[in-house]
């Protein structure tokens, strides 16, 4: 790794509809081939559907959904001697949010609904109600960390 100064984080501008940075970041994660307007339509539609069914504001629903997906712990591989251990480590706050967003998009794409909007809305609602594949992924990650608690002293 070069020993130069740390790279400055790029500032993500808030999205046009809700003026929220989290929504803007999620749009960027959903976006494929630079088609931002398509990603915006899909997310805004999904947020409206989810908010309608949950009976709350769209941004609140999305944030609660992401809070339910965010992992607190994860495992990292650490080589000690000849063997590799899965060492549980706490997840940094920025990484928590980005993992939650990635998992939300990934597991919404595996759903059986017809359109991307419906898939996203379904996964957002499931995560809002503490169900769904993305929440299961968080639980599995926590279980892995708990199972490997014996190796916690190898943390670096």
Swiss-Prot record:
GO terms for cellular component: small ribosomal subunit. Coiled coil: none annotated. Keywords: Ribonucleoprotein, Ribosomal protein, RNA-binding, rRNA-binding, tRNA-binding. GO terms for molecular function: rRNA binding; structural constituent of ribosome; tRNA binding. Part of the 30S ribosomal subunit. Contacts proteins S9 and S11. Belongs to the universal ribosomal protein uS7 family. This is Small ribosomal subunit protein uS7. It comes from Citrifermentans bemidjiense (strain ATCC BAA-1014 / DSM 16622 / JCM 12645 / Bem) (Geobacter bemidjiensis). The gene is rpsG.
């Amino acid at each position: 790794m070069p020993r130069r100064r740390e790279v400055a984080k790029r500032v993500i501008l808030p999205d046009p509809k809700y003026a929220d940075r989290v929504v803007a970041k999620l749009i960027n994660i959903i976006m494929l081939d630079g088609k931002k307007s398509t990603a915006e339509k899909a997310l805004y539609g999904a947020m409206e559907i989810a908010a309608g069914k949950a009976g709350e504001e769209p941004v609140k629903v999305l944030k609660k959904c992401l809070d339910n997906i965010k992992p607190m712990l994860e495992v990292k591989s650490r080589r000690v001697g000849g063997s590799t251990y899965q060492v549980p480590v706490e997840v940094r706050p920025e990484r928590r949010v980005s993992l939650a967003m990635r998992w939300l998009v990934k597991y919404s794409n595996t759903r059986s609904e017809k359109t991307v909007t419906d898939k996203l809305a379904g996964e957002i609602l499931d995560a809002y109600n503490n169900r769904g594949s993305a929440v299961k992924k968080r639980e599995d990650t926590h279980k892995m960390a708990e199972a490997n608690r014996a190796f916690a002293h190898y943390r670096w």
